[in-house]
C-alpha cells in the first residue's frame, strides 16, 4: 500500500477480537510502522464487531477527512440491518474485501459497499497477492481518485474500477 503512494497515505488499524474488544491504533504513514502494529495482534475467538468498526470510522471522519475504509473479513455475525444503518451514516466509501464465499457475508458486504458507493471484492483464501493488489489499488484511489486508479497497471485497480465507475 505504502509503496504505491510513497509519503501520501496515513493508515489507522482498527481490529476486533474476543467478546468485546475493538481497538484502534494511532495513525501511521509508513509500512514498517503498520507492520509493527499488526505483529502485536493475536486472534481470539468472538463475534464479529463490524458495526463498531463502522461507527469508529464515522467518528474519525468527523474529526478530519478519512478518504476510505478498508475492511477485510470472512464472516459476519451481526444483524445486517444494523450494519446497513451504520453504513448509510458513514460518510466514507467502504472497500469491503471478502475472503471466501459465504453467501450471507457476500450479500451483506455487497450492500454495505453499495450504500457507501464503494466496491465489494472477493479474494481466494490464502491468496495474499490478491489482497495485496486490492490494498495497493485502494491506496492509489485514496490519494489520487479515479484518475490515479485508471492510470494504474495494478490488477487490483481493474477490479475496483469495474465497481466504482
Task: Show where each model-derived region lies.
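Von Willebrand factor
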Residues: 1-26, 32-72, 76-79, 100-110
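A general structural motif
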Residues: 8, 64-66, 91
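Hydrophobic/aromatic beta-strand patches that form the interior of the parallel beta-sheet core
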Residues: 12-14, 70, 95-98, 119-121
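Acidic, Ser/Thr-rich peripheral helices and adjacent loops at domain boundaries
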Residues: 29-40, 113-125
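A cross-taxonomic marker for long C-terminal extensions/tails that follow the last structured domain
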Residues: 69, 73-77, 81-82, 144-153
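VWA/integrin I-like adhesion module and closely mimicked acidic/polar interface patches used
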Residues: 75-115, 123
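C-terminal "exit" segments of structured domains
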Residues: 120-165
Amino acid at each position: 500500500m505504502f509503496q504505491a503512494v510513497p509519503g501520501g497515505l496515513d493508515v489507522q488499524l482498527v481490529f476486533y477480537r474476543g467478546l468485546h474488544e475493538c481497538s484502534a491504533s494511532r495513525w501511521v504513514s509508513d509500512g514498517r510502522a503498520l507492520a509493527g502494529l499488526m505483529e502485536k495482534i493475536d486472534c481470539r475467538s468472538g463475534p464479529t464487531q463490524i458495526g463498531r468498526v463502522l461507527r469508529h470510522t464515522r467518528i474519525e471522519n468527523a474529526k478530519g477527512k478519512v478518504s476510505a475504509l478498508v475492511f477485510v473479513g470472512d464472516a459476519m455475525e451481526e444483524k445486517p440491518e444494523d450494519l446497513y444503518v451504520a453504513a448509510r451514516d458513514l460518510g466514507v466509501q467502504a472497500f469491503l474485501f471478502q475472503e471466501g464465499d459465504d453467501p450471507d457475508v457476500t450479500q451483506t458486504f455487497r450492500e454495505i459497499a453499495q450504500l457507501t458507493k464503494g466496491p465489494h471484492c472477493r479474494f481466494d483464501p490464502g491468496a495474499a497477492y490478491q489482497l495485496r493488489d486490492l490494498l495497493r489499488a485502494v491506496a492509489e484511489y485514496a490519494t489520487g481518485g479515479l484518475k490515479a486508479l485508471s492510470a494504474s497497471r495494478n490488477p487490483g485497480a481493474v477490479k475496483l474500477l469495474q465497481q466504482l465507475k
